[in-house]
Structure formats: C-alpha cells, structure tokens
Design a protein with these regions (language model features):
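...the same signal can extend to comparable exposed beta-sheet modules
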Residues: 1-212
Length: 212
C-alpha cells in the first residue's frame, strides 16, 4: 500500500520475510507506515518466495550525548515529549553518512541533522543514516493523499514523513522555509527561514539629543 493506493500479490506458503535487514516471522511487519516492500519470485511461478521490508523512521536531531549514547529528537511522541533513542540498548548499531559510508555515530549525528532509522523487530539491531540536505524555498501549496502530506516546492512535489517536525506556522503556503530532506528525499522537517518576510522589531536603549 502506498498512500491511498492498494495492490495485492500472491505469496508462496513457505515465504521468507526480512524486516529491516533481519529475519522476521510475524505478518504484522508486512505493511510499514513509511517504507518499501520488495517481493522476490525465485522460481518464477508467480508466487513470491521472499519479502524484504524496509521500515523507516526519520527525525530531526536536537542533541546527542556521546557519554550515554542517547539521541534526543526535536520530534515529539504522543505524550508531547521529545523522542529519545538509547543506542546502548542495541546489540548491533551501524551508522552511515550522507555518502552511504560506514561511520561512527558520534561523528555524524549532530544537532540539526536528519537521521533515518531502521530497527529490527526484536529491537536488537538499529541502522542509522544521516542527511544534511536542506532546501531554502517557498512552500507553494499543501495537499494530502490519505495520511501523507504532500508539498509543492519549486514546481516539484515532496512527501512528508510520518510525524514530520514542523513548528507552528512553519509550513504556511506562500512562506519561505528551510526544508530538511531525509536520505530518501522525503521531507523530515520544515523550519521558518531566518530571512523569511515579516515584521522585525527593535527598541532604542539610549538617545542623545544635542542642543541646537
């Protein structure tokens, strides 16, 4: 299923499934909210033998503590609290930079970057990809396809990730914004541009008036 469109395929009765790079034996993981599903028909009998599921979560980083290996996100959970991920809780933790090269998490996870995360179903493995791609553009319009928001920017259409980080009013149509993309080219965060048009206020602290 992609947004509001649904397709159906026939699986072999003994199919194997791989979820976020690890074997899985639970059909609940077959339909990721944000991800891809690849079907493989090894013996060409029109029944798929292998299902490869990539389930992504993309967030904007607020802070990373190298000591306790916690990533704190700007994104909030359903209780309004910052989402936090404890990397030390995983047996396997792999990170890659914008070029897709392996790197130490502490070297590439910085405030303001976007991380795209894949966690295994048994919560023993986590894979992190970092993106620092930012567009400074005017938001032309916003539409929706099911629960997926789509933004027209610079004549192109971009989909937002689930739980996209958008402070109040940052995605107002007609406004200029800093648009942060994740590794898949989807919008992970929208922030008001510092040079966006609007009133600017100031005040005078001291005034000297010379006698004429």
């Amino acid at each position: 299923k992609t947004s509001s469109q649904t397709a159906r395929y026939v699986l072999d009765r003994t199919f194997d499934a791989v979820y976020n790079r690890r074997p899985v034996f639970d059909s609940r993981y077959m339909m990721p909210e944000y991800g891809t599903v690849t079907l493989v028909d090894n013996n060409h009998d029109d029944r798929y033998d292998v299902v490869i599921i990539n389930d992504f979560e993309s967030f904007m980083v607020e802070a990373y503590s190298e000591n306790d290996r916690f990533i704190t996100m700007k994104n909030r959970d359903e209780n309004g609290k910052n989402i936090r991920i404890d990397l030390s809780a995983y047996d396997v933790c792999e990170a890659e930079n914008e070029a897709g090269e392996r790197a130490e998490a502490s070297a590439i996870i910085v405030p303001g970057s976007v991380v795209t995360i894949q966690r295994s179903a048994d919560e023993k493995s986590i894979y992190i990809s970092v993106s620092r791609e930012v567009m400074k553009e005017t938001i032309e319009s916003i539409t929706a396809d099911g629960e997926t928001k789509k933004y027209s920017i610079g004549g192109n259409l971009y989909e937002a990730v689930p739980n996209c980080y958008i402070p109040d009013g940052a995605d107002t149509p007609g406004s200029k914004a800093d648009i942060y993309l994740d590794k898949n080219g989807r919008i992970a965060a929208i922030m008001k541009s510092e040079d966006a048009e609007g009133w600017k206020y100031g005040y005078i602290q001291k005034v000297w008036v010379e006698d004429a």
